[in-house]
């Protein structure tokens, strides 16, 4: 081994358990998986841990819409997530859920330690409340205009446009994202984490090298604005963990979500039995803990999380690594264009190794966005993996099998092999630093050299000459040695290809074994290892993404539309036949013989109509007199046993007490046409 063994725990952000994985998500899991596989390839003890983030109001509401219990829904999503990851060759050592006994115990433990340390404050707050749904609105379920930059349609906790954080009550023109109703203020008791108490510690930690410089600079801006106490409470109804000693109060999902890293690792330790949880999480731990995350959740992972850990007596992360967003063809992922591609849709059409390589080729240690240009994707995979890498073996392996009994020669001139081996430290340093793009360029530069060597030597010409057989054997053996080194360098990125190459060489590809002498080593017959990317398959994937959108475009409706769907479409000509007029209710009286009817005398501007309206359950007759309303004036008269009804007034609502007669704004006059 090149260096002493390290103890490493690495995590990716926990995917939310209310929907499928897409290619934007996959960037992070591929990035982390490459790093984890590299550490293991180098001989280190590395554990890659993840879980589904399974709590919160969105989970609760989605389950309600599907007619399922939240526990049932998150269990189903967990299976789907794990299958997607497995098929992309993402090798977690443990994949769990935040809705677990381990996570409940750890969340309660951390909370109680923070409370005992004086870091939990209680106060009564005024919070937005949805009067239609009778529920307090979590910050992500309030939308409105950002109070900082004035961008519209922003969530109640932070602005996607400017990155500002704020409370939902600061939003301009807030509305409930659940019902669309204008929320009202209502008092409730909440618990707060005293984040400002950790400012000194956080300033030191964020400048300790634990963060990328871009992240550290962004945090300086937040420090200048001043840290705020963090509301860690949500009111029932809520799907999550109830706060100890506080019935009806639940932990905010962002409190127990990062603790999910610990919960999943605890589950892993208990299953294994030979790994000590405290060796990785105790305050004096010498192990390394790394979190890979997206840039949109930096605030939680670089302020709240280390402060919570410190206050509860645990260690802080060694580093938090953030990445940018994925764009497709230079633009934000789009459902209408078919570029919002689910992981499963990709897998239905293309090899996952293609995307693993393409992402690796474009990833750096910076927080830059990564563009998945689908045309470039096909060209790069075909050029690098098929044209350079696999082609190196396909052009030479057949000669070894057919002419030299499948055995490699002892390479007389090892200068080329030595030059490839000389790059292993450089490539290792690039992997370690998450500079995958630079590592891929180094490896592909070597592939160019190897292909140039084969092209110049032309073994297909040498084998035709009796006196050149040994030279042909040497050239092909040399080329396959170079191929083995290249695939070993790429093993963290292309695990499936590496396995195929291991079967071909009949040996494991190891970093320590890069300089193995393969003289006389017998190889298996060569089989095709990778197909070219066909653009028609890429196009089919995009088209399938559009079709998936068509299938799911109709959202699960809640509220009035769920109970009373919109009627079939009518033509404009049909609508134009309806004559709607403003009417003054001159007189209203109950119809004794009828349970639902009021008899109305309506003035429509020079003519008085008698109309029977089924609104008795919602209105007292005297409350209607003198009000304006809207009636259908050209409806054919209808003879009823109480008299003739000469039209219809318009009202909204499901019935009973929930009926609301339409009333024009001030200024409207009886007889005016409504159009």
From Swiss-Prot:
Binding site for Zn(2+): 146, 149, 159, 162
One cellular-component annotation, GO: cytosol
Catalytic reaction equation(s): tRNA(Met) + L-methionine + ATP = L-methionyl-tRNA(Met) + AMP + diphosphate
Cofactor note: Binds 1 zinc ion per subunit.
Cited InterPro entries: aa-tRNA-synth_I_CS, Anticodon_Met, Met-tRNA-synth_bsu_C, Met-tRNA_ligase_1, Met-tRNA_synth, Methionyl/Leucyl_tRNA_Synth, MetRS_core, MetRS_Zn
Cofactor(s) listed in the protein's UniProt record: Zn(2+)
GO MF, one annotated term: ATP binding
Renumbered ranges of motif 'KMSKS' region: 332-336
Motif segment ('HIGH' region): 15-25
Coiled-coil regions, chain positions: none
Record GO biological process: methionyl-tRNA aminoacylation
Highest taxon above the source species: Bacteria
Protein's job: Is required not only for elongation of protein synthesis but also for the initiation of all mRNA translation through initiator tRNA(fMet) aminoacylation.
Quaternary structure, from the entry: Homodimer.
Family per similarity comment: Belongs to the class-I aminoacyl-tRNA synthetase family. MetG type 1 subfamily.
Protein name, as recorded: Methionine--tRNA ligase
Lineage: Bacteria, Pseudomonadati, Pseudomonadota, Gammaproteobacteria, Alteromonadales
